[in-house]
């Protein structure tokens, strides 16, 4: 691990790692070498040829290239404490970066190389501008190579974070250069993931800048001219953005770099560019420097390049792969992934007001980053009071009253899409195909996977940048910053109201005093724009429920019920979804998006759903995108008389052409994906942010009305403290509903974006590609015909191959999964994503430790009497009936639900069957999970049934009891049966609570009268109140979600636990090979499996005898599962695949009866009906397939027999008296096999087989 040096600003100069640096011919500054080649300079950055000066009136002016700015001239200029804090903060970030694999590799790369020197026959020298100068302790002037200098923010803006190449050309052409990094660790941007907002981790953003510096150092900054250009047509409401270099997108990494990857692969490093690296390597190898330092420099370069020296020849292919590793393996996203840091989904994203924080140890550590997480709710993140931003005035005349309405909008909030110019003039031509052409196949593998798995990082694996020509040292510094021209127009006149007017109409004025005036919610946009006491809402019911109370509520209960009504109406309207099958690949339409954002309101009488169905996805676009066209030229084959006389080379040329054709299709697809991303998806992403803003405005307006009602409350004054709590909880409930709705909105928007790509853009190029295919086929046919005499018998094969692959009716399929992420997988597994997003607590076992597996690291105490045992999938928790067998979970805000906060609890539980020892507990309720003092909730057991109880602060109690009996629910639902049951309890505090077992609804009760079940008590997992001290329970995956799942989601949640192909035994645990089981039939529970020898047939016949039962009380009758006796058979399933110990669906195995051998079909020597009966035989294999023809959540399986014409399912004979025996013989039923899927499975159970292992939870 690289050693990070630690300094204080007042440490004395040592002339080695702490120096007084003279740089850019400026006054000396104190610099600290944190690792070799990287220096920290705790000063403001003021070394630039930028002629734009910071205005004196800093509070009112923002420069053209900025979105947000903070002006402060004094910071980091004279205060030693500020300088020391800056130095310590950067050091902390370096330690955090260095603690990751990627970060450590990055710092090693930077610290073990220098920009490529000037090379001649007898000399190797560094360029002067890539060095720093300082005085040694003894007064000598020292010149030393340097790679990176890290400064504080620039003089013009404290929010600056950027990397400047000291020579912009040499950063791209292979020579390489030193970099200045401008950085502020305390001012942090705010980003979004889904509907959540978070603050960037400064270690992640510093890593981003260091990667830029690495590219500059090696001279491999993206050399192409391609940029994402953003139009400046201000009359179209297009925002003003800098051009985004592909260098920026690739340095960030993530999904966006994958999208543009195929588009840039070809131009990234042309072969002649890489070949020159080999030439430079030879030049260094052949030089003969005189001075020791130069010899050492030469040897270090040779050591770094040796991995690419293959027997004296420079391996350009391997070197190019190495460059690609650096490009696609080292990026900010991969660093964030390794450190589990939240980062934005896309490089280009809406910027939100930044935050300020100190990086003290109680706020930020090297290991965890932000101790309390990155959410903007973290109180350590402060609002920046003196933040300024660039605005534009939008003016429009209303349609009804003809009033000119002007609003101020941040330019950052305007739309931005890629300019078509950035995609034009792309060369899709190809050189003539040769027999040895290097053709790459389309792949979806990750460069990062290759990078991390296949690269070993040590000094010999570094490589220096290589000059293309002998360099002439420039006389001045080149400033490489892009400063685009921006339209300075500050006011825009428009014909109609825009989305921004609608959003502004939903916003409460900053100066509005909600304690004195009521803010009315109205459904008229013009009424709102003309009256500051009104806000616009697209939600009619919500407006009615908010406005119906003028003022003067006189009772706390009435106030509470009014809050509930408002929340309920708002939530119901947010949950609106219109299912549709009229627009391809769209699951549903969110109908209020139109009226919220003024989309399509002039169409279909304001019906957004109908307008969307009629016009499609394009209705969402604020600006109609203009796409660059593609010009394709047919592939041609290089013809050479000598080569074309060789059959193998002719065939290679044809095959390479066909492979290149596939590559071309994928290249064109990738080009269209890049345009879609820059012109369509950016607009869709803006729409998502606009809806987030809209719902936020709605909540603010609703809360303002609540505060108004509180200030005008006519009841007792001592009620107001309680009412404040109600309002606080109501705001949480409103935000929860909005976040939930945003997930539906986001899905609708993302599906719309992908639909446009699949159904509009991709088809638009297919006809062009088919013409390309036809022209290419013509060239191939001519080439094959010309060389038919050489091909001989392969002529027909080659022609058939061309005809097949270039058939006009075929095309190369576009793989939607090739679009990196974009939530496609999330859309497919939306329930899983939603549950993960809402999971706030998950008690389980990991690495033999009981912990919170949700990622929230909830504090819990596990007492010594709690055991970890084998469970439903792996290890699970066992609670015993003793004082030390308990788990105490300290509650945090995430799991403290009150008033209006919905939640769901789900868990797996295995409770032993009631036996005689349990009689002393009959009629007694005892606790399993308790979070109740004077109020709260708990889960308990009574007479083998589960009890869910809620109690509010006024003592009102709601109970749900399963009320099942053993006899009618033993297999499926009864809790005390020793079988794993999945319990789900949903609590919708505005309506009801519901209890489910195994995904099926058992009971539901209204909880509308309950008023607050929150408390500060811990959640205690403990058997408390029972008399039987031998009792125990097994508990697994106890999860709490911060929303109430609906009925279909509960069913899906239960089914999600059965995605594996592993079959399960009678108890619900994995079925295992070579383990002893009793095998019982569902039709005759309690009927033991026996065998009998029939001498006249010479075989042992297995059969099931009559059911045997026993009583544990006068009202509970229980079937025997364990059977004793010399003729009772236990079985083992014998593995034929040797994969692992678990039995999976469709495994072929032997069912071995422990006494008499394998279960097989009788030999075909008796009557036809008897040939289908099963016998036991030591010498023959049964080759039975264990299958599951019903849903995966069943704890039984079917057994299929394969035997010539007697295929069937293992069943029991209808005639119990066959062979004069009192029982049911086993046979192969072809009828059941043919008809199983059409049968009433509640009646037809004879082919369902359980495997029962002996367990301490079931005693007989």
Swiss-Prot record:
Disulfide bonds: 395-406
Region: HCN, residue numbers: 825-1065
Regulation: Preincubation with the metalloprotease inhibitor 1,10-phenanthroline before injection into Anopheles or Aedes decreases toxicity.
CDD domains reported for this sequence: Toxin_R_bind_C_BoNTX_like
Active site: 209
Cofactor names: Zn(2+)
Record field: catalytic activity: Limited hydrolysis of proteins of the neuroexocytosis apparatus, synaptobrevins, SNAP25 or syntaxin. No detected action on small molecule substrates
Known outcome of mutating residue 1231 to A: No change in toxicity when injected into A.aegypti larvae
A GO molecular-function annotation: metalloendopeptidase activity
Pfam families: Peptidase_M27, Toxin_R_bind_N, Toxin_trans
Record-listed E.C. numbers: 3.4.24.69
Region described as HCC: 1066-1260
GO annotation (BP), single: proteolysis
Class of the enzyme per the UniProt entry, highest EC level: hydrolase
Domain of life of the native organism: Bacteria
Stored InterPro entries: Bot/tetX_LC, Clostridium_toxin_transloc, ConA-like_dom_sf, Kunitz_inhibitor_STI-like_sf, Toxin_rcpt-bd_N, Toxin_trans
The family this protein is said to belong to: Belongs to the peptidase M27 family.
Further remarks about this protein from its record: Feeding larvae with P.bifermentans strain Cbm (subsp. malaysia) is toxic to Anopheles mosquito 3rd instar larvae and less toxic to Aedes aegypti larvae. The presence of 4 plasmids, including this one, is required to kill mosquito larvae.
Protein name as catalogued: Paraclostridial mosquitocidal protein 1
Organism of this sequence: Paraclostridium bifermentans (Clostridium bifermentans)
Gene (name only): pmp1
């Amino acid at each position: 691990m690289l050693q990070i040096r630690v300094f204080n600003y007042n440490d004395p100069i040592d002339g080695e790692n702490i120096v007084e640096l003279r740089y850019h011919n400026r006054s000396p500054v104190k610099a600290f070498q944190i690792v070799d080649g990287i220096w920290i300079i705790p000063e403001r950055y003021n070394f630039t040829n930028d002629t734009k000066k910071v205005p004196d009136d800093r509070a009112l002016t923002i420069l053209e290239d900025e979105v947000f700015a903070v002006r402060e001239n004094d910071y980091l200029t004279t205060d030693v404490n500020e300088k020391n804090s800056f130095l310590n903060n950067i050091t902390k970030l370096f330690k955090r970066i260095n603690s990751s694999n990627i970060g450590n590799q990055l710092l090693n790369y930077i610290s073990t190389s220098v920009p490529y020197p000037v090379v001649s026959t007898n000399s190797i020298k560094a360029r002067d501008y890539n060095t720093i100068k300082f005085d040694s302790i003894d007064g000598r002037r020292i010149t030393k190579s340097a790679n990176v200098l890290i400064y504080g923010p620039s003089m013009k803006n404290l929010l600056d974070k950027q990397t400047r190449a000291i020579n912009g050309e040499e950063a791209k052409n292979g020579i390489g250069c030193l970099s200045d990094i401008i950085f502020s660790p305390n001012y942090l941007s705010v980003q979004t993931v889904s509907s959540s907002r978070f603050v960037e981790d400064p270690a992640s953003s510093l890593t981003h800048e260091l990667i830029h510096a690495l590219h500059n150092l090696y001279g491999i900054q993206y050399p192409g001219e391609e940029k994402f250009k953003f139009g400046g047509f201000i009359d179209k409401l297009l925002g003003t953005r800098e051009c985004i270099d592909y260098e920026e997108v690739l340095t960030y990494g993530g999904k966006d770099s994958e999208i543009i990857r195929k588009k840039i692969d070809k131009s990234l490093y042309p072969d002649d560019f890489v070949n020159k690296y080999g030439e430079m390597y030879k030049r260094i190898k052949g030089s003969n420097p005189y001075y020791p330092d130069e010899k050492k420099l030469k040897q270090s370069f040779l050591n770094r390049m040796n991995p690419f020296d293959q027997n004296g020849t420079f391996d350009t292919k391997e070197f190019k792969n190495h460059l690609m590793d650096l490009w696609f393996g080292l990026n900010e996203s991969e660093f964030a992934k390794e450190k589990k840091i939240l980062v934005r989904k896309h490089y280009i994203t809406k910027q939100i007001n930044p935050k300020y924080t100190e990086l003290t140890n109680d706020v930020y550590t090297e290991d965890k980053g932000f101790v309390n997480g990155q959410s903007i709710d973290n109180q350590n993140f402060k609002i920046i009071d003196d933040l300024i931003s660039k605005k534009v005035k939008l003016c429009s005349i209303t349609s009804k009253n003809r009033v000119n309405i002007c609003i101020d909008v941040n330019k950052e909030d305007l739309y931005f899409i890629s300019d078509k110019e950035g995609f034009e003039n792309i060369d899709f031509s190809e050189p003539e195909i040769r027999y040895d052409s290097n053709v790459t196949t389309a792949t979806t593998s990750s460069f990062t996977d290759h990078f991390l798995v296949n690269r070993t990082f040590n000094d010999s694996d570094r490589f220096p940048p290589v000059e293309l020509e002998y360099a002439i040292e420039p006389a001045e510094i080149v400033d490489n910053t892009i400063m685009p021209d921006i339209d300075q127009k500050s006011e825009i006149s428009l014909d109609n109201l825009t989305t921004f007017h609608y959003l502004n109409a939903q916003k409460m004025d900053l100066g509005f005093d909600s304690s004195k005036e009521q803010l009315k919610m109205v459904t008229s946009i013009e009424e709102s724009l003309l009256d500051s006491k009104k806000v616009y809402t697209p939600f009619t019911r919500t407006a009615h429920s908010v406005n119906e109370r003028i003022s003067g509520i006189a009772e706390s209960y009435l106030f509470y019920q009014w809050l509930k009504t408002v929340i309920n109406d708002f939530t119901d309207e947010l949950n609106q979804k219109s299912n549709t099958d009229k627009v391809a690949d769209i699951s549903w339409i969110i109908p209020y998006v139109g009226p919220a954002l003024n989309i399509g309101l002039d169409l279909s009488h304001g019906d957004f759903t109908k307008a969307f169905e009629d016009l499609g996805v394009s209705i969402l676009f604020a600006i109609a995108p203009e796409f660059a066209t593609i010009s394709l030229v047919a592939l041609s084959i290089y013809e050479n008389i000598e080569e074309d006389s060789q059959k193998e080379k002719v065939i290679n040329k044809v095959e390479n052409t066909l492979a290149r054709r596939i590559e071309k299709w994928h290249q064109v697809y990738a080009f269209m994906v890049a345009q879609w991303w820059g012109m369509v998806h950016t607009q869709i992403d803006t729409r998502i942010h606009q809806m987030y803003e809209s719902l936020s405005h709605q909540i603010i307006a609703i809360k303002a009305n609540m505060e108004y009602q509180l200030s005008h409350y006519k009841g007792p004054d001592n009620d107001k403290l309680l009412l404040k709590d109600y309002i606080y909880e109501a705001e949480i409930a409103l935000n929860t509903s909005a976040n939930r709705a945003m997930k539906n909105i986001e899905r609708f928007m993302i599906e719309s974006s992908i639909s446009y790509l699949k159904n509009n853009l991709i088809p638009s190029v297919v006809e062009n590609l088919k013409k390309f295919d036809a022209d290419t086929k013509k060239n191939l046919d001519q080439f094959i015909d010309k060389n038919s005499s050489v091909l001989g018998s392969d002529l027909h094969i080659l022609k058939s191959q061309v005809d097949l692959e270039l058939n006009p009716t075929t095309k190369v399929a576009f793989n939607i999964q090739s679009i990196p992420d974009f939530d496609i997988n999330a859309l497919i597994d939306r329930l899983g994503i939603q549950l993960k997003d809402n999971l706030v607590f998950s008690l389980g076992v990991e690495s033999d430790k009981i912990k919170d597996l949700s990622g929230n690291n909830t504090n819990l105490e596990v007492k010594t009497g709690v055991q970890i045992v084998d469970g439903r999938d792996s290890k699970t928790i066992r609670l015993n009936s003793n004082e030390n067998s308990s788990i105490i979970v300290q509650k945090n805000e995430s799991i403290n639900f009150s008033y209006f906060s919905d939640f769901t609890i789900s868990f797996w539980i295995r409770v032993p069957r009631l036996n005689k020892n349990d009689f002393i507990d009959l009629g007694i309720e005892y606790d399993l999970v308790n979070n109740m003092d004077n109020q709260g909730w708990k889960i308990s057991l009574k007479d083998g049934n589960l009890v869910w109880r809620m109690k509010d602060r006024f003592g009102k109690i709601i109970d749900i009891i399963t009320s099942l009996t053993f006899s009618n629910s033993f297999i499926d639902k009864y809790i005390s049966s020793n079988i794993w049951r999945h319990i789900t309890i949903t609590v919708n505090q505005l309506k009801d609570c519901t209890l489910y077992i195994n995904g099926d609804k058992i009971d539901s009760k209204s909880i509308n009268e309950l008023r607050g079940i929150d408390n500060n008590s811990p959640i205690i997992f403990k058997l408390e109140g029972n008399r039987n001290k031998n009792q125990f329970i097994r508990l697994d995956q106890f999860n709490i979600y911060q929303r109430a799942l609906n009925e279909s989601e509960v069913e899906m949640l239960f089914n999600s636990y059965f995605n594996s192909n592993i079959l399960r035994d009678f108890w619900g645990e994995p079925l295992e090979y070579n383990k002893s089981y009793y095998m019982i039939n569902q039709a005759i529970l309690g009927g033991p499996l026996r065998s009998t020898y029939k001498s006249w047939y010479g075989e042992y016949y297995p059969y099931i005898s009559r059911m045997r039962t026993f009583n544990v009380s006068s009202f509970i009758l229980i079937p025997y599962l364990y059977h004793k006796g010399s003729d009772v058979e236990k079985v083992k399933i014998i593995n034929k695949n040797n994969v692992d110990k678990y039995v999976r669906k469709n495994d072929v195995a032997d069912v071995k009866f422990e006494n008499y051998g394998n279960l097989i079909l009788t030999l075909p020597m008796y009557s036809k009906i008897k040939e289908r009966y099963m016998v036991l035989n030591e010498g023959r294999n049964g080759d039975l397939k264990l299958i599951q023809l019903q849903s995966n959540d069943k704890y039984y399986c079917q057994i299929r027999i394969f035997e010539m014409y007697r295929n069937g399912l293992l069943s029991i004979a209808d005639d119990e008296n066959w062979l004069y025996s009192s029982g049911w013989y086993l046979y192969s039923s072809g009828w059941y096999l043919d008809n199983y899927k059409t049968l009433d499975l509640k009646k037809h159970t004879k082919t369902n087989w359980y495997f029962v292992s002996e367990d301490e939870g079931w005693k007989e």
